[in-house]
């Protein structure tokens, strides 16, 4: 998907992680600043939305700024590199990306806050669609433990996935 649809050659670690997310339910990536973690997450989100239908992709991070100004802007950048047919299928809003003709398929941004961990409750996948519920966690080291505990309940759906990236602390 990344090489064909986005016309990019991933770094070795990104390629390995892309293969891992296709075959494993959970992956975590720890690395320093500026190595392409947010680009990687953008690729994963677009891949899930366009290849797993229906698909729900709740995305969280330690701050609204990280979600809106970093992850969402990176997603928009990479979406512009998709073939025109795929681009036309995506609707971008400030905190949500939807597929035009499949209302059950979306990615949504929810800030991870200790005082409102329930923001990640209520998501359910489709058991016969691998990856139909996929949690994306940006800057995972800054996300409070209670948020992970709340999200864990939804991960009982067969085929659900979790992708976490962050800097080691």
Q: Across the structure, where does each feature detected by a protein language model lie?
A:
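Phosphate/NTP-binding elements of NTP-utilizing enzymes
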Residues: 1-169
